[in-house]
Regions:
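N-terminal hydrophobic targeting/anchoring segments and the immediately downstream early-domain regions
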Residues: 3-23, 29-180, 237-247, 251-252, ...
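Divalent metal-binding pocket/active-site signature
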Residues: 140, 153-240
């Protein structure tokens, strides 16, 4: 089934084909973007979560103007009972943010460390890409909230409360007990952290948080909050996906919800396609309004690296996730009873994904102004308001 460019969109409508029936590229195809240079000049491309790549040429090739850059580092920690856990510790993350800051400073022709939302516009004016440093989990704030100040001075501008599992601040989406998944609230220390982040101008990220903790944080925050990378539970009934009431609450507070690239949380279809990604975007728009919809990645800019080595063969690529998936299935965590069959949408697992998404949402009937909001305008609005 061929990809349909929006240049042929009007003709198809005239033939009686509705927007919901329009085909998008099947897995393995590599459609060429039809977004023209003048159109691109008017649009912002902002990625809600990726990483500083080993090859910095990936940044220019991706055509993104800015992205939330996860600079987390994980340290092996021995628990009191002798078991080993892996956490984003203060020490590990302080080292990693320092290294990332030095790397950005060494490439002023290409990169700008964004310390305020306004830096995104300055970066674009200077043909740079703006990076908003983020850490995926408040575990890095260990001893005192004064450590938030230390990270802030190093350039941290987005902090995620949890990563998969809860901590002293908030419940995680995948928390469980002997009876199955649990939905834990924000703790007293979590409320203090929210207040501190608001005071400092650090954007609060609810990705990986439990639904209850997400609602608590939204209610407590004096600023918009975001869920930088996730998907809708109404489409895939899974603990890692967000229920509509969380999406709506984020939107009502002026925040945004970024839809990521992990296809097993985007669709239950056996072959993930771009249209499934667009369906997630449309669902967020229907629930929270167009001002809440945003793009995210959660893989490196060029894509999920193991899948790229495998030629985007999902049958092979999904194998690395199955032991972890099975472990949570045994704990009766929502959604893990259905084994995944894919990891990526092949036609989006590449450096050109933003332009391809731009094409796809225009082909699906989003207006040009709506597409501009989704591709980066909504991210820009929130970053400028909060950071």
């Amino acid at each position: 089934m061929p990809d349909v460019s929006r240049r042929s969109f009007a003709g198809l409508l005239g033939a009686g084909i509705t927007a919901s029936q329009l085909p998008l590229a099947i897995s393995g195809c590599s459609p060429v973007s039809t977004v023209t240079d003048p159109e691109r000049a008017q649009s912002w491309y902002i990625d809600g979560l990726s990483f500083l790549p080993a090859d910095l040429s990936d940044i220019r090739a991706s055509k993104i103007d800015a992205f939330i850059c996860d600079i987390s580092a994980i340290e092996q920690v021995e628990q009191a009972d002798g078991t080993v856990n892996y956490r984003r510790t203060y020490r590990a993350c302080m080292e990693s943010i320092g290294a990332a800051r030095a790397r950005v400073a060494a490439h002023p022709d290409l990169l700008r460390l964004a310390l305020t939302g306004a830096d995104a516009r300055l970066a674009r004016k200077e043909a740079q890409t703006a990076l908003f440093f983020q850490i995926q989990g408040a575990d890095c704030v260990e001893e005192s909230l004064s450590q938030v100040d230390e990270f802030y001075l190093e350039g941290l501008r987005v902090l995620q409360l949890t990563h998969h599992y809860g901590n002293v601040y908030a419940g995680g989406a995948l928390d469980s007990d002997d009876r199955g998944g649990v939905n834990l609230p924000l703790s007293a220390r979590g409320y203090e952290l929210v207040e501190k982040l608001n005071q400092r101008g650090v954007l609060i990220d609810l990705s990986h948080a439990s639904a209850r903790s997400a609602h608590d944080a939204i209610a407590a925050s004096s600023q918009p909050v975001v869920l930088s990378h996730g998907a809708a539970r109404a489409i895939v009934n899974h603990a890692r996906c967000s229920p509509d009431n969380v999406i709506r609450a984020i939107a009502d507070g002026g925040g945004v919800f970024g839809v990521f690239m992990m296809s097993f949380w985007l669709t239950t279809a056996p072959e993930p396609q771009t249209r499934h990604y667009v369906e997630q975007l449309r669902h967020v728009a229907n629930v929270g309004g167009i001002d809440a919809v945003a793009i995210a990645n959660d893989y490196p800019l060029r894509g999920q690296e193991n899948l790229l080595r495998l030629g985007n063969d999902n049958t092979q690529g999904v194998q690395e996730y199955l032991p972890w998936w099975q472990s949570l299935s045994e704990r009766n965590v929502l959604g893990f009873d259905r084994q995944p069959s894919h990891v990526v949408i092949p036609e989006l697992n590449n450096l050109d994904r933003m332009a391809r998404i731009h094409d796809a949402i225009l082909d699906a009937g989003f207006s040009a102004s709506e597409a501009d909001k989704v591709m980066g305008g909504n991210w820009l609005r929130v970053l400028e308001q909060v950071v």
